[in-house]
Amino acid sequence: MVLSEVDIAKADPAAASHPVLLNGDANVAQKNLGSVAENNLCSQYEEKVRPCIDLIDSLRALGVEQDLALPAIAVIGDQSSGKSSVLEALSGVALPRGSGIVTRCPLVLKLKKLVNEDKWRGKVSYQDYEIEISDASEVEKEINKAQNTIAGEGMGISHELITLEISSRDVPDLTLIDLPGITRVAVGNQPADIGYKIKTLIKKYIQRQETISLVVVPSNVDIATTEALSMAQEVDPEGDRTIGILTKPDLVDKGTEDKVVDVVRNLVFHLKKGYMIVKCRGQQEIQDQLSLSEALQREKIFFEDHPYFRDLLEEGKATVPCLAEKLTSELITHICKSLPLLENQIRESHQRITEELQKYGVDVPEDENEKMFFLIDKINAFNQDITALIQGEETVGEEDIRLFTRLRHEFHKWSIIIENNFQEGHKILSRKIQKFENQYRGRGLPGFVNYRTFETIVKQQIKALEEPAVDMLHTVTDMVRLAFTDVSIKNFEEFFNLHRTAKSKIEDIRAEQEREGEKLIRLHFQMEQIVYCQDQVYRGALQKVREKELEEEKKKKSWDFGAFQSSSATDSSMEEIFQHLMAYHQEASKRISSHIPLIIQFFMLQTYGQQLQKAMLQLLQDKDTYSWLLKERGDTSDKRKFLKERLARLTQARRRLAQFPG
């Protein structure tokens, strides 16, 4: 709440004749106020304004602006629109002036009204530099120095912030961000793309929902043609957080004053927050070294005497003091409106950073004994995750699949390969049987089953499965290796030597286990070349095949052996061999479909994981390598420190928001 003349008049009518100046030496006017009125106003101020301002100031002091946008007012306008003059009038200090681009870096102007102090204080800070200022006349020089340091001494601009803090009895409680004036064409030493760069910088600020756009427009131009208002409308089409400020009313052409009044009364280009009109120091007044306090007095007289604009003064829409009051009121309202969203953002950021910090773990201890315990914890966590993988109990996200589930899919594919291999087309199998009958039957009489034919076909069909089994071994091995590597990344990512060592162990053990697994798979298929099955098991399987054939014959769905009708004895021999093949296939497929996955699981999951766990524990035996293994990536420590600082800021911010009376 800015102490306006209206407020003072209500508190003490006798004081109404003494204007309260926001800039320059206002002490004389302040001393003339009655003590009762002053106490009353201070009480109102403390109750309504200070809690909101102090909350945001405290969050800003914590550095929360590094994490989240806080409510503020951004001042934008076309070049030479009078932005600097408005800011000077509000802050009471002279800011850089001149031709071309004067504001080359975003200037955060933090104004804090002192209630019980008379001393003026200022501070300029940028990058790692900070300087206290005790004389308002030094501000312009320090701002120019800051801009030259950040953006160079040419005409370029920078996104880097300069912060000017002013504490005084004569300023309103506001946070303003002064942005470079919009230019369309590069002139002189300006970069060719200066216009684009400035617009990009401005949009970065005004698109934030937490920012009120204060659009400065000269009164003597067509408001519809101003770039600044167009940019504000682009990011705030409803005009919910845009305020229009008309400047230079003394330069309005005669006969057009009523159009200016219509603009201020929101009848031309509608903004929900409306418009204000102010008259700041002109160029001649600046050259004549007119003080800011005197300029405010002249402004008041100008509007009081103006035949068109005096009504705007009576409506509270004219003069810098009224503007200051409106801006403070708007900022307070905006703060209160933004607090629920800000609270949610802080809570969500706090949770996100907490989770991110957990990935970086705690700092590596300096003490050697502590390093050993630290490394033990790291390796134990890794080994526990490997155990979870082996047992099929690892934690996965909603969209992820457990390793064992993926392995089961591969084993299911293997059973399909076996089934497809054994279930050849009956005509193809019949031709194969006839070939072996003609090739190997010898002197046996027709109708007798040739065991050599049966055995040869069985061996060939089983042999055909050997390479697919080895391929499955390689596929599963890659899946397990990648899963183990992911566990290493999860646990050791920030310790590149430890992660690299774990990857080396993973690869070495993989190669060894894969060789052993392949050796046993090939041994199994060598054993499968011995055609064997328990007698009672085989008899049972053969009986089932024959019963099934008999049932199908009854239903007139017997196998088609029409191509081999040379004799009933040949038919009988063919069918007999076919039945034996089907019976043996059933039993052999049971063995192979289960035994090969068991071999792969044993070597490439169980033993692989256990050997890896032992190898990682062996790292603890060499104490001289602890420091090397626990060496972090160059930015890990800095990142952890950065996250801790952010977390501390957000924790304090949550606490202060919780304590805010609301």
From Swiss-Prot:
Task of the protein: Interferon-induced dynamin-like GTPase with antiviral activity.
Positions that bind GTP: 77-84, 178-182, 247-250
Residue ranges, annotated region (G3 motif): 178-181
GO molecular function: GTP binding; GTPase activity; microtubule binding
Region (Stalk): 367-632
Annotated region described as G1 motif, given as residue ranges: 77-84
Region (G2 motif): 102-104
Main location class: cytoplasm
Top-rank taxon: Eukaryota
Gene3D superfamilies per the UniProt record, alphabetical: Dynamin, middle domain (1.20.120.1240), P-loop containing nucleotide triphosphate hydrolases (3.40.50.300)
Span list, region G5 motif: 279-282
Induction remarks: By type I and type III interferons.
Protein name as it appears in the record: Interferon-induced GTP-binding protein Mx1
Keywords of this entry: Acetylation, Antiviral defense, Cytoplasm, Endoplasmic reticulum, GTP-binding, Immunity, Innate immunity, Membrane, Nucleotide-binding, Ubl conjugation
Membrane topology recorded in Swiss-Prot or TrEMBL: Peripheral membrane protein
Organism (species): Pongo abelii (Sumatran orangutan)
Record note on domains: The C-terminal GTPase effector domain (GED) is involved in oligomerization and viral target recognition. The middle domain mediates self-assembly and oligomerization.
